[in-house]
């Protein structure tokens, strides 16, 4: 899980979602998991 100030989609399978006010990227590739904070 990467914690970044700006989260971006890395590949086409990345999905931007909001969980409890936090922007997250979920993907089939675990390396692409990101969280804003």
UniProtKB/Swiss-Prot annotation:
Subcellular location(s) per record: Plastid, Chloroplast
One Gene Ontology term from the biological process aspect of the record: translation
Pfam families hit by this protein: Ribosomal_L36
GO annotation, cellular component aspect: chloroplast; ribonucleoprotein complex; ribosome
Keyword Plastid: yes
Domain of life of the source: Eukaryota
A Gene Ontology molecular function term of the record: structural constituent of ribosome
Keyword annotations of the record: Chloroplast, Plastid, Ribonucleoprotein, Ribosomal protein
Predominant location: plastid
Similarity comment: family membership: Belongs to the bacterial ribosomal protein bL36 family.
Record's protein name: Large ribosomal subunit protein bL36c
Organism: Tetradesmus obliquus
Gene it is expressed from: rpl36
